[in-house]
Amino acid sequence: MQNQRIRIRLKAFDHRLIDRSTLDIVETAKRTGAQVHGPIPLPTKKERFTILVSPHVNKDARDQYEIRTHKRLIDIVDPTDKTVDALMKLDLAAGVDVQISLG
């Protein structure tokens, strides 16, 4: 698998969960002899919602909610076969979305 790159994008609502998962991936890749670039923090997406509290009157009474989506990027350069096997066996938290692309 020479001259290849594995790009891993992680998304999560909890920043502690995503940091722990990136640390696990980086340690696993380095332990198997691959070169790692990252984790690179990508911009956090903030979604804000405003909801009326009262169903009839009191238009001024509103609640505001926010969801933050944290993202990280990890590049693994020149992965070995051991690296791919170890990453496949790696068990990550349930709240982390993982996208893997080969390039």
Swiss-Prot record:
Classification via SMART domains: Ribosomal_S10
GO biological process, one term: translation
One GO CC annotation: ribonucleoprotein complex
InterPro entries xrefs: Ribosomal_uS10, Ribosomal_uS10_CS, Ribosomal_uS10_dom, Ribosomal_uS10_dom_sf
Keyword vocabulary terms for this entry: Ribonucleoprotein, Ribosomal protein
Protein family membership: Belongs to the universal ribosomal protein uS10 family.
Cited function: Involved in the binding of tRNA to the ribosomes.
Protein name in UniProt: Small ribosomal subunit protein uS10
